[in-house]
């Protein structure tokens, strides 16, 4: 979230410990918004993949020694002056290469083909006709068949480089898929990584298995063992302090670190008063009693709610919560040191791979985009601590898989995403303890109804929102004037886009009745049917 100073250099960029132990695929990023999906699809095949911007691809290739390379899509045109390009050293290295969209165009041009501007952009669903066989299509597409794909391009390949043949075409792309079987170079004008290309995952699997010959040995069990060794090597006999938010990321990180170094870890759980119902009790029970991990539980709700009184701007809410979290966390760390346990040299946090992937700016050079965490941002600088980030190579779904590998209860591992500022951004307008109590109860009833209906695991995220308005109602023989609760539920694969979940009317009616009957202060319930875009998943 926001309240952070810059992330220290020790966390600026991936540093895979899997590099020496497993086969790897290097993904060269040309700025596509869906490059992360390529990495996820490859990892689903049990092969470690890493994304680097094209400017750093040559150095990364030498360091990683990958068994294959994928060139991503991107917004640029190969016809532009100083257009991004793949290092020729990679194209001459003898490893399989797959080009996707812009990756196809730059591969074709760099190897002697011709790319021209199209008469019109081709964006959205398109039909591919397979004109010849190749390793990518084996067992997936047949010669002469027509298949749906997702296109997003303006330029197109019009002349093949030597050694290539066209194996598929589309209406706007006469050369839609190309193959050089001898060099194991393949490229496609469409995006196989997105769900809108139904057979895309199978095509990528063929590149991994049949073209690159990789079997897939990167598992969460292997990651767990390697991460434990890495933590022990980094920490030695030092002490680690970990800020728990109650979410999956920080919890999995803490349990993994505790498995590595035991009592050298102390966790600090700051309850800011904006958690879900019984969340504080659940965290304390899990860490103190189930895992026997040293835990300091701080109820700072009075302090947080006092500072938030009168604050209505959502960004100011985030900044206030982030600033206070740092203050409280730092104070507790000093108390731990004063008790004779010694000052912690290391700060653990649940940074994930999307937080550290370097993005590319084609006008201003490379820029590192690292998500600031509302709960620990700025602490390493202020407290002179080194970072321990055992999850920084993983995507969210991989963190959940690691949690299961570590034995976390499914009801905890499979929880829907929850924002760092908590219910503060699900309560538009000013926050009060009364409003939070109402929202907490309404949310609990809603989630309980979803679980009873067997829908929880089918939904990406579901929650209640307490609207800053009251409406007139009738309950019994009396008039009421109480709050409105909004219900939100979405389906998504990655959180970047989302559709509202289509509950049936019976479920919505029963849930609304339960909330109104069980939660004092609510007399009306509405359902949010906005997708993302144009809306966001959270209301603030």
UniProtKB/Swiss-Prot annotation:
It is an enzyme of class 6 (ligase). Coiled coil: none annotated. Residues 218-415 form the GMPS ATP-PPase domain. Residues 24-217 form the Glutamine amidotransferase type-1 domain. The active site is at 101 (nucleophile), 191, 193. Transmembrane segments: none annotated. Keywords: ATP-binding, Glutamine amidotransferase, GMP biosynthesis, Ligase, Nucleotide-binding, Purine biosynthesis. GO terms for cellular component: cytosol. It comes from the Bacteria. InterPro entries: Class_I_gatase-like, GATASE, GMP_synth_C, GMP_synth_GATase, GMP_synthase, GMPS_ATP_PPase_dom, NAD/GMP_synthase, Rossmann-like_a/b/a_fold. Its EC number is 6.3.5.2. Pathway: Purine metabolism; GMP biosynthesis; GMP from XMP (L-Gln route): step 1/1. ATP binds at residues 245-251. One of its GO terms (molecular function) is ATP binding. Pfam families: GATase (PF00117), GMP_synt_C (PF00958), NAD_synthase (PF02540). It catalyses: XMP + L-glutamine + ATP + H2O = GMP + L-glutamate + AMP + diphosphate + 2 H(+). Homodimer. Catalyzes the synthesis of GMP from XMP. This is GMP synthase [glutamine-hydrolyzing]. It comes from Nitrobacter hamburgensis (strain DSM 10229 / NCIMB 13809 / X14).
């Amino acid at each position: 979230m926001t309240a952070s100073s810059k992330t220290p250099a020790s966390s600026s960029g991936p540093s895979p410990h899997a590099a020496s132990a497993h086969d790897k695929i290097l993904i060269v990023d040309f700025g596509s918004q869906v490059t992360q999906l390529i990495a996820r699809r490859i990892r689903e095949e049990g092969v470690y993949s890493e994304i680097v911007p094209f400017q750093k691809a040559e150095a990364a290739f030498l360091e990683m020694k990958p068994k294959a390379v994928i060139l991503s899509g991107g917004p640029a045109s190969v016809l532009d002056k100083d257009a991004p390009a793949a290092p020729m050293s990679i194209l001459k290295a003898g490893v399989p290469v797959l080009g996707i969209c812009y990756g196809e165009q730059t591969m074709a041009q760099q190897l002697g083909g011709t790319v021209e501007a199209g008469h019109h952009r081709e964006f959205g669903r398109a039909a591919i006709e397979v004109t010849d066989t190749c390793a990518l299509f084996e067992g997936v597409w047949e010669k002469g068949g027509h298949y749906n794909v997702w296109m997003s391009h303006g330029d197109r390949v019009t002349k093949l480089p030597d050694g290539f043949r066209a194996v598929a075409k589309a209406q706007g792309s006469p050369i839609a898929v190309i193959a050089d079987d001898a060099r194991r170079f393949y490229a496609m004008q469409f995006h196989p990584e997105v769900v809108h290309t139904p057979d895309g995952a199978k095509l990528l699997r063929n590149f991994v298995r049949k073209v690159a010959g990789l079997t897939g040995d990167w598992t969460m069990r292997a990651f767990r063992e390697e991460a434990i060794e890495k933590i022990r090597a980094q920490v030695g006999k030092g002490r680690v302090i970990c800020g728990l938010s109650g979410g999956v990321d920080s919890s999995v990180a803490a349990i993994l670190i505790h498995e590595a170094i035991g009592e050298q870890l102390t966790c600090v759980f700051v309850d800011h008063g904006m958690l879900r119902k019984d969340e504080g009790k659940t965290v304390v029970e899990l860490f103190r009693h189930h895992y026997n991990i040293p835990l300091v539980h701080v109820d700072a709700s009075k302090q947080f709610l006092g500072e938030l009184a009168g604050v209505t701007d959502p960004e100011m809410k985030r900044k206030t919560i982030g600033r206070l979290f740092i203050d409280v966390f730092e104070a507790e760390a000093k108390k731990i040191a004063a008790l004779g346990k010694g000052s912690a040299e290391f700060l653990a946090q649940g940074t994930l791979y999307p937080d550290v992937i370097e993005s590319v700016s084609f006008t201003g050079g490379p820029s590192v985009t690292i998500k600031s965490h509302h709960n620990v941002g700025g602490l390493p600088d202020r407290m002179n601590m080194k970072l321990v980030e055992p999850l920084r190579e993983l995507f969210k779904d991989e963190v959940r898989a690691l949690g299961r590998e570590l034995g976390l209860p499914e009801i905890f591992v499979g929880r829907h995403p929850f924002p760092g500022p908590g219910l503060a951004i699900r309560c538009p307008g000013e926050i009060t303890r009364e409003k939070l109590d109402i929202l907490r109860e309404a949310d609990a009833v809603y989630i309980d109804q979803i679980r009873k209906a067997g829908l929880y695991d089918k939904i990406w995220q579901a929650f209640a929102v307490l609207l800053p308005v009251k409406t007139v109602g009738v309950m019994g023989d009396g008039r009421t004037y109480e709050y409105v609760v909004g219900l939100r539920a979405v389906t998504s694969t990655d959180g970047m886009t989302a559709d509202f979940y289509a509950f049936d009317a019976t479920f919505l009616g029963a849930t609304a009745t339960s909330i109104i009957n069980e939660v004092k202060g609510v007399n009306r319930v509405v359902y949010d049917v906005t997708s993302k875009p144009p809306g966001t998943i959270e209301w603030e």
